[in-house]
């Protein structure tokens, strides 16, 4: 999903729970300064949202300190806004010349031959070439599985463009800023991502829960309010899937959501073109913070910059931010194979709440559930190396949002600040889990619209 400005030169008083906040934000993957992944990647190697409305990982920040630094001088908001506009929107205005051989491909045989020739010419590292071929084979099989009579045409069209974009990035690596705005010209990366993922969704077995609440969210954004979607996270394709399920009814949300993304989706060559088409707040994953000890401090500083960018955006109002406070993508229970939302980190939830509170703009946290794991399931375990195997399938997907949960009402029933924080996080998670179970009954249980409950009204608005 994802824009800015502010004034006030003093930091809003902190909530009574603590003077400084250790912020744990759960995200997916992204790339900033050289990371362990990017170092191993340049020779190879998604957790993405659109431009005008992954993957999950964890960050640690001092929210109060970052906010204080952010507002130290009266010119900071204006200068930072200018800098954000200059650095986060169009880092590649004019594309450099590069090999366009993939765009001339007219058959599967030519496509595979082109990968081989570009590798032999030294333009593609062998591991990237192997990843390209595997991606093509898996994508082709999934689209053919859909039964679309134009499957072959769709596969060739989408894959030639995807491989062209991957090769471009290998030749001229794209560098993400801490706040990245989706690139829409001269090449529209957002539409590219939408077109690529669309054939993988079985819309006949896909559902949106509580559609009217998405309209309420848009109205709040129009009023200048901020909205944070507290969500579970299932695949690298989550941003595109969310956008595709809402593009007919809520195009503003579909294109403008800002996704908090971890460094790995910004470092993997097979994933970067899709990330370029999404609005992102880029962070380094806590899970990979110490992969290369000498880079740890650089990563922490980059994360602090990202936090400041987010604070600036929120102070301007009308921001829609998606975040997964679980620390990673959902994974199936190893003993049963059943999928459930991964538990939320209470610190991550609390610090998003505090950022909203400190913005001096009305803000709302909505619990959002997403079910789409079969389309692009993650590896069974968290991997250190960049370049995971991408399993792809044609399947149904589900998205549901529930009413926002009042922090004040929960705080009124607890005396201990830590209990309040845990209870609020649990209330959000329980709502996500409840909605997820309804989507699961509708999609996996084949109950369709009949799975609707008093709390989740399902529809198919396409």
Swiss-Prot record:
GO terms for molecular function: glycerol-3-phosphate O-acyltransferase activity. A motif (HXXXXD motif) lies at residues 233-238. It is an enzyme of class 2 (transferase). It holds the Pfam family GPAT_N. SMART domains: PlsC. It comes from the Eukaryota. Its EC number is 2.3.1.15, 2.3.1.n5. It is found in: Plastid, Chloroplast stroma. Keywords: Acyltransferase, Chloroplast, Lipid biosynthesis, Lipid metabolism, Phospholipid biosynthesis, Phospholipid metabolism, Plastid, Transferase, Transit peptide. Pathway: Phospholipid metabolism; CDP-diacylglycerol biosynthesis; CDP-diacylglycerol from sn-glycerol 3-phosphate: step 1/3. Residues 1-82 form a transit peptide. GO terms for biological process: CDP-diacylglycerol biosynthetic process; phosphatidylglycerol biosynthetic process. GO terms for cellular component: chloroplast stroma. It catalyses: a fatty acyl-[ACP] + sn-glycerol 3-phosphate = a 1-acyl-sn-glycero-3-phosphate + holo-[ACP]; sn-glycerol 3-phosphate + an acyl-CoA = a 1-acyl-sn-glycero-3-phosphate + CoA. Transmembrane segments: none annotated. Esterifies the acyl-group from acyl-acyl carrier proteins (acyl-ACPs) to the sn-1 position of glycerol-3-phosphate. The physiological acyl donors in chloroplasts are acyl-ACPs, but acyl-CoAs are used as artificial donor for in vitro reactions. The enzyme from chilling-resistant plants discriminates against non-fluid palmitic acid and selects oleic acid whereas the enzyme from sensitive plants accepts both fatty acids. Squash is chilling-sensitive. Does not seem to discriminate between the acyl-ACP thioesters 18:1-ACP, 18:0-ACP and 16:0-ACP. The HXXXXD motif is essential for acyltransferase activity and may constitute the binding site for the phosphate moiety of the glycerol-3-phosphate. Belongs to the GPAT/DAPAT family. This is Glycerol-3-phosphate acyltransferase ATS12, chloroplastic. It comes from Cucurbita moschata (Winter crookneck squash).
């Amino acid at each position: 999903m994802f824009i800015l400005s502010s004034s006030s030169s003093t930091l809003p008083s902190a909530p009574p729970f603590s003077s400084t906040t250790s912020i744990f934000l759960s995200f997916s993957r992204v790339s900033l300064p050289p990371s362990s992944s990017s170092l191993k990647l340049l020779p190879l190697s998604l957790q993405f949202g659109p431009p005008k409305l992954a993957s999950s990982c964890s960050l640690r920040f001092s929210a109060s300190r970052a906010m204080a630094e952010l507002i130290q001088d009266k010119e900071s908001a204006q200068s930072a806004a200018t800098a954000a506009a200059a650095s986060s929107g169009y880092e590649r205005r004019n594309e450099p010349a590069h090999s366009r051989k993939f765009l001339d491909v007219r058959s599967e045989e030519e496509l595979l031959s082109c990968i081989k020739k570009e590798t032999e010419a030294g333009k593609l590292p062998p591991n990237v070439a192997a990843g390209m071929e595997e991606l093509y084979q898996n994508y082709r099989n999934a689209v053919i599985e859909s039964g679309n009579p134009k499957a072959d045409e769709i596969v060739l069209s989408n894959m030639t463009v995807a491989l062209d974009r991957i090769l471009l990035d290998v030749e001229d690596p794209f560098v993400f800023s801490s706040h990245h705005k989706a690139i829409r010209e001269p090449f529209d990366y957002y539409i590219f991502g939408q077109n690529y993922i669309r054939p993988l969704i079985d819309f006949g077995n896909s559902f949106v829960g509580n559609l009217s609440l998405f309209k309420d969210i848009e109205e709040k954004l129009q009023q200048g309010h901020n909205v944070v979607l507290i969500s579970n996270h299932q695949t690298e394709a989550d941003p595109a899937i969310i956008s595709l399920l809402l593009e007919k009814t809520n195009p503003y949300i579909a294109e403008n959501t800002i996704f908090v993304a971890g460094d790995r989706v910004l470092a993997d060559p097979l994933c970067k073109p899709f990330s370029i088409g999404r609005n992102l707040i880029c962070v380094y994953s806590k899970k990979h913070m110490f992969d290369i000890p000498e880079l740890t401090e650089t990563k922490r500083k980059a994360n602090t910059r990202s936090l400041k960018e987010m604070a600036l955006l929120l102070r301007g109002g009308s921001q829609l931010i998606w975040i997964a406070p679980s620390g990673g993508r959902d994974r199936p229970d190893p003993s049963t194979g059943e999928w459930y939302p991964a538990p939320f980190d209470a610190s991550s939830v609390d610090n998003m709440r505090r950022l909203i509170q400190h913005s001096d703009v009305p803000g709302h946290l909505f619990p959002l559930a997403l079910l789409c794991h079969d389309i692009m399931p993650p590896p069974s375990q968290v991997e250190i190396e960049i370049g995971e195997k991408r399993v792809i399938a044609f399947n149904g997907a589900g998205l549901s949002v529930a009413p926002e949960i009042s922090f004040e009402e929960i705080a009124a029933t607890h005396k201990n600040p830590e209990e309040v924080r845990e209870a609020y996080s649990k209330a959000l998670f329980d709502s996500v889990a409840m909605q997820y179970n309804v989507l699961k009954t509708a999609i996996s249980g084949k109950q369709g619209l009949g799975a609707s409950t008093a709390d989740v009204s399902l529809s198919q608005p396409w």
